[in-house]
């Protein structure tokens, strides 16, 4: 995969899995098998060996980068003659639907918390910043859910700006995958973390992607380090269909689920509907809005069969 893309060859250092794993440099494993089980997403097969080979070296890299930024901050405070300021380090994780962004984010959060320099690590997903279901229906955007126009970008940018500026308590809306909507009256409070991990489809987009105003600030303007989780589209579609079948047997069986009407489908019917959703919504969104932002990332995690990481690309 890495050899076919001349842009990636120009911009990134490429590591095969074995080469990357050596960079762990004796960082201890801090997760148990039970911990990992709690962090896995639906249809995810990540193992402790995957954590050892891929995520421990990445946590070491991020620790070194965060420490460097903390030191630069102290130098600036001393130069300005001011009290030490608090500005969270912000890591974004982007990628397609079904690629495993959420699992990657949860594993990194768990690992980064064990470093003494940054024990407070919060995780926020941009799903909560999707417009409420009623608004999407009113705007005719229900079939565009996940596309840039389905997000309340003003609210998202205001949230990330407030966190970055060091505000004591900042609230983020919470999304329910059962009701397919924001949860009214509930929020997640972010209180001056050392690191904030922001996970979502759209976190690498910039003002250049905006049809409205290229000058307005975007999430990427506030991000210190960005990660893109990548895979070939035929694998992503396959994983989405497999996940859809898992949901049909699990979450969709809940009578409160927005997709409860899918619970009684046969395997063939469920596969056909999942394929149609991919071909009409998730696939086009990937091709038009998500994948074009890939080479903006500081690091790309490339997945192959069975969700296993095959290569890591690190910006030069």
UniProtKB/Swiss-Prot annotation:
Record-level Gene Ontology MF annotations: ATP binding; pantothenate kinase activity
Catalytic activity: (R)-pantothenate + ATP = (R)-4'-phosphopantothenate + ADP + H(+)
Principal subcellular localization: cytoplasm
One example of a Gene Ontology biological process annotation: coenzyme A biosynthetic process
Amino acids binding ATP: 95-102
Compartments, record wording: Cytoplasm
Gene3D superfamilies assigned to the protein according to its UniProt record, in alphabetical order: P-loop containing nucleotide triphosphate hydrolases
Pfam family, one: PRK
Protein name per its UniProtKB record: Pantothenate kinase
The organism of origin for this protein: Shewanella sp. (strain ANA-3)
